[in-house]
Curated annotation (Swiss-Prot):
Organism: Wigglesworthia glossinidia brevipalpis
Protein name listed in UniProt: Large ribosomal subunit protein bL21
Family, as annotated: Belongs to the bacterial ribosomal protein bL21 family.
Gene this protein is translated from: rplU
MF annotations from Gene Ontology: rRNA binding; structural constituent of ribosome
Swiss-Prot/TrEMBL GO biological process terms: translation
Amino acid sequence: MYAIFKINGVQYKAKSGSVVCLNKISGDIGSTIEIKKIMALFNDEKIIFGQPFIKNSRIIATIKKHINGKKISIVKFSRRKHFKKITGYRQKLTNIKIIDICC
């Protein structure tokens, strides 16, 4: 069984017991979170779609760690002016482990 859920405007696909990397969410490491915005549930026998979300369903997950993503370099350059500016950016990410999908 797997589900498609939405957190902070982004949709993710998850199975029970899997680890999902998503944009940073607030919370301490080891704390339990409950996700109620489930858009679709896929089981062996049936498929359930929400309009837009499924009522009385939830995903229970724990926060494993907060990490930084891969560094992205941004370069500004002007020709013939001897100007070059390089900046970098790292996205903040959170790994969560899906414990249970309740429907």
